């Protein structure tokens, strides 16, 4: 997303405030391709960078510039162009070792480091604890969520655009839904509409089937689209999240 330099600085300053408030030497932000409340949002919020494969890691320091480990050459080049972080590095093949090397490079062998513990792999934690026994790992996700809920005017415009894309996707679905059309075709129409107008993430769910009021049959529960063909008399339910 194309956020301004002012928005970048606002987020960076907010993260620096967390570092000071909680007495942290650094924040470890882990991004991956999963979907969920805390499962990459902190990372993307700070870096403005999408993870398209495996994981990426950003380390935000209290006393020096942040670093982003972005992946292979393709992902690193993309991060250098699009992320908020200038120092973007390739992953060597062992991301945890890369992070450890960076912490040692910055002279960080003791103190407190914030991390979303739900995102921190057990293997990484055991490795870091062995190599950096004087580091205390501190849960930081809820503090960062507080920042993410405090929306700037620029962010509010993005949310308004997302709402508009959702409305337009619903209208596109109405034009497509009819007997003989598959769930795949309906969701493709929704996502094509949003993608064409700038939607870069899609979480589109659908279900179709018979629903009779008062009958034991329940309203179809939305899930990932399938090849199921919509039939006459079906009810179609949707979740549209561009």
Q: Residue locations for each model-derived region?
A:
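Short, basic, helix/turn surface patches
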Residues: 53-60, 166-171, 232-233
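N-terminal accessory/capping or targeting/presequence segment of soluble
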Residues: 1-101, 222
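Short catalytic-site patches enriched in acidic/histidine residues
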Residues: 36-50, 131, 140-146, 150, ...
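Short, charged beta-turn/beta-strand-edge "cap" motif at the junction between a beta-strand
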Residues: 1, 119-120, 241-242
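Glycine-rich, N-terminal phosphate-binding loop of Rossmann-like dinucleotide-binding domains
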Residues: 31, 117, 240
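Receiver (REC) domain switch-region micro-motif
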Residues: 27, 113, 236
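Flexible, acidic/His-enriched mid-domain "rim/lid" segments that flank
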Residues: 6-12, 20, 94-202
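Acidic, glycine-rich active-site loops and adjacent beta-strand->loop/helix elements
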Residues: 32-34, 119, 210
């Amino acid at each position: 997303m194309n956020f301004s330099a002012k928005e970048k600085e606002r987020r960076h300053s907010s993260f620096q405030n967390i570092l000071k408030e909680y007495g942290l030497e650094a924040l470890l932000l882990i991004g991956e391709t999963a979907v969920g409340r805390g499962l990459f949002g902190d990372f993307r919020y700070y870096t403005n960078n999408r993870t398209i494969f495996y994981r990426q890691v950003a380390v935000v320091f209290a006393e020096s510039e942040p670093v982003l480990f972005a992946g292979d050459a393709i992902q690193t080049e993309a991060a250098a162009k699009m992320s908020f972080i200038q120092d973007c590095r390739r992953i060597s093949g062992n991301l945890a070792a890369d992070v450890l090397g960076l912490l040692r490079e910055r002279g960080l062998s003791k103190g407190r480091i914030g991390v979303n513990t739900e995102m921190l792999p057990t293997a990484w934690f055991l490795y870091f604890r062995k190599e950096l026994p004087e580091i205390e790992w501190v849960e930081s996700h809820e503090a960062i969520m507080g920042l993410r809920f405090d929306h700037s005017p620029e962010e509010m415009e993005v949310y308004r655009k997302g709402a508009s894309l959702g409305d337009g996707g619903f209208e596109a679905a109405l034009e497509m839904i009819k007997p003989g059309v598959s769930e795949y075709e309906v969701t493709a129409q929704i996502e094509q509409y949003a993608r064409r107008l700038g939607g870069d993430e899609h979480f589109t769910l659908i279900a179709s089937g018979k629903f009779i009021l008062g009958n034991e049959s329940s309203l179809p529960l939305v899930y990932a689209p399938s090849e199921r063909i919509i039939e006459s008399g079906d009810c179609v339910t949707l979740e549209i999240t561009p």
